[in-house]
A protein has these predicted regions:
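Short solvent-exposed beta->alpha transition segments
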Residues: 3-6, 11-15, 20-77
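Surface-exposed, charged secondary-structure patches
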Residues: 50-101, 109-115
Length: 115
């Protein structure tokens, strides 16, 4: 809940289409090696650290896509399917948490999903 003058109102739910567009732009930037574009969708992490992490990931990603988007109130859960050239990890699924910042969906956290 957020406070408005004299009122309490629920936090706005995320827009699924906007989240899907942002998530797709992010993962396609990673897959194409455009680290500068990919880092624009990350919130709360040091930009230099995020850029270095994404550069390492981009080296092994061969194809990636948004697999699922589910809205959970003020957050969205986005699952990615990522194909890689990494030995022993040809397919990785990631689950990420996105939230709205000034009207723009940004990635907050993520982890690999056990297969």
């Amino acid at each position: 809940m957020k406070r408005s003058p004299g009122l309490w109102e629920p936090l706005r739910s995320m827009d699924e289409r906007a989240v899907r567009r942002a998530a797709d732009a992010h993962i396609q930037a990673v897959a194409s090696g455009d680290v500068d574009e990919a880092v624009e969708y990350i919130f709360g992490e040091d930009v230099g650290k995020a850029r270095a992490n994404l550069a390492r990931v981009a080296e092994v990603v061969t194809r990636a896509e948004v697999e699922d988007v589910s809205i959970k109130g003020p957050e969205a859960i986005v699952q990615f399917r990522v194909e890689t050239s990494a030995p022993g990890h040809p397919l990785v699924r990631l689950e990420t948490v996105w939230a709205d910042h000034a009207g723009r969906p940004l990635l907050h956290a993520g982890h690999a999903i056990e297969q």
